[in-house]
């Protein structure tokens, strides 16, 4: 299809020809004026179209993918009418929180399929023509790849390529020469050498992304067939190469700093304007470059301004990765906290004690709150073993249900809620708080989003909620966020 600039020049040429024709008929003033109006109208239209970004639709497998943007909508439901809210919103990006990382591969595929089918109806109803689709997932390569991207490609079809872009600079994740690294205590570690690669559900053996793709696709995509977009390529421009891609070609993308993805996304958007269609399997930093939203309204250090009361707040810690455990230890050293442990071994071994456990936890929360303390509710830290992945997922749901009952039983005038862990945060938004959608305020710490409930929320109106991923931040990260909100 011709590009918008070409169309613009054609319109100008035709308009000038019209003016010339009417000059020869002797009605110069009247038709010159009409011709100028015609040119102005079409130039304005084309300029608007050229400056308008495509809608960026993010299917987020937990609620932390918005950790580099602000002001957009997070949708906890995906019926057609709710999706239309996101599509019609003035902000160019919105997130659909599918929480598929907490599901089995089959369940993840079913949810993704339902979202895509509803999206097709919502896109048609809103008359959206230009859009990009991002399957947002973990910057440490955990998640249902290629299950989700395969379903998206089938349902929304016609993609020329899909790209893996796992760089997340705020969290210390970079990609160089197609190898994905984590910074741990200032040292670059190939991601396959970290605890995340040993995840009992999403484990893997490779940091070299083409090999990771071959491993995860069961050799359906060979490593040698993966297009590698290296730093020198990106920094010198990739438009011609992007234009040549077709047939949902798999590509992997380097990134050492945000400027690298800025350049890459500039080329992506230019080529997309020519009619190419791309799908992304991405961490959060790509979204910064695609959305181009600028600075958030209130800086991180001053986000306590969003608190509706001066009462104590609550911290809920569900994530059990080593980084979270370290951060929890530092948090519990802070003044004004009241530690409340949820004994998950007791829940597993004595499921009949669940209601008793719930009442015990809520009693401790009330006592701490009444004493002016900030309750820190956290699951016991031992990593439990199960016979298979399904048993582990099922028990994880039982833990989550208990924690969400705790959320629903919190004092109504708490001033903030910090949720630690991606899956925990999703459940807090969709189940504990029962939200259909929420507006993102921004980041209170690099990689940590804050949203706020609406004024009409039946239990916690205008409550700021921090979505803190389990694998983000240094050892003082959780204590820093707590300090910014409790001070």
Which residue stretches match the model-derived regions?
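Short, flexible loop segments at boundaries between secondary-structure elements
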Residues: 283-292, 302-305, 442-465
């Amino acid at each position: 299809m011709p590009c918008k600039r070409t169309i613009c020049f054609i319109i100008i040429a035709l308009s000038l020809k019209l003016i010339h024709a009417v000059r020869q008929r002797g009605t110069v003033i009247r038709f010159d004026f009409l011709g100028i109006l015609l040119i102005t109208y079409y130039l304005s239209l084309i300029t608007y179209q050229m400056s308008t970004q495509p809608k960026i639709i993010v299917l987020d497998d937990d609620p932390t993918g918005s950790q580099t943007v602000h002001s957009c909508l997070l949708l906890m439901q995906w019926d057609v009418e709710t999706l239309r809210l996101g599509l019609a919103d003035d902000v160019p990006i919105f997130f659909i929180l599918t929480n598929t990382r907490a599901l089995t591969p089959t369940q993840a595929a079913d949810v993704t399929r339902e979202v895509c089918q509803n999206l097709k109806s919502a896109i048609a109803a809103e008359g959206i023509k230009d859009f990009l689709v991002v399957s947002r997932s973990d910057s440490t390569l955990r998640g249902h790849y290629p299950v989700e991207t395969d379903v998206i490609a089938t349902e929304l079809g016609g993609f020329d390529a899909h790209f893996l872009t796992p760089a997340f600079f705020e969290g210390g994740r970079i990609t160089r020469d197609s190898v994905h690294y984590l910074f741990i205590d200032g040292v670059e570690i190939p991601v396959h050498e970290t605890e995340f690669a040993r995840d009992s559900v999403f484990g893997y053996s490779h940091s070299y992304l083409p090999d990771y793709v071959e491993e995860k696709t069961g050799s359906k995509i060979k490593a040698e067939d993966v297009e590698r977009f290296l730093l020198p390529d990106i920094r010198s421009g990739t438009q011609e190469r992007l234009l040549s891609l077709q047939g949902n070609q798999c590509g992997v993308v380097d990134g050492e700093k945000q400027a690298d993805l800025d350049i890459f996304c500039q080329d992506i958007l230019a080529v997309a304007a020519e009619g190419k269609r791309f799908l992304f399997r991405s961490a959060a930093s790509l979204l910064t470059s695609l959305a181009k939203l600028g600075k958030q309204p209130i800086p991180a250090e001053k986000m306590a301004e969003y608190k509706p009361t001066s009462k104590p707040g609550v911290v809920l810690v569900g994530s059990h990765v080593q980084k979270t455990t370290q951060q929890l230890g530092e948090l519990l050293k802070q003044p004004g906290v009241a530690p409340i442990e949820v004994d998950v071994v007791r829940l597993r071994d004595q499921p009949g004690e669940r209601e008793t456990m719930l009442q015990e936890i809520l009693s401790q929360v009330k006592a701490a709150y009444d004493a002016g303390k900030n309750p820190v509710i956290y699951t016991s830290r031992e990593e439990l073993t199960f016979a298979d992945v399904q048993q582990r997922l099922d028990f994880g749901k039982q833990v989550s249900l208990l924690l969400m009952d705790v959320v629903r039983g919190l004092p109504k005038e708490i001033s903030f809620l910090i949720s630690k862990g991606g899956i925990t945060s999703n459940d807090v938004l969709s189940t504990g708080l029962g939200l259909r959608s929420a507006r993102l305020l921004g980041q209170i710490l690099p990689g940590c989003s804050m949203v706020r409930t609406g004024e009409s929320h039946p239990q916690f109106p205008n409550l700021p909620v921090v979505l803190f991923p389990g694998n983000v931040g240094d050892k003082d990260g959780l204590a820093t966020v707590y300090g910014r909100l409790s001070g």
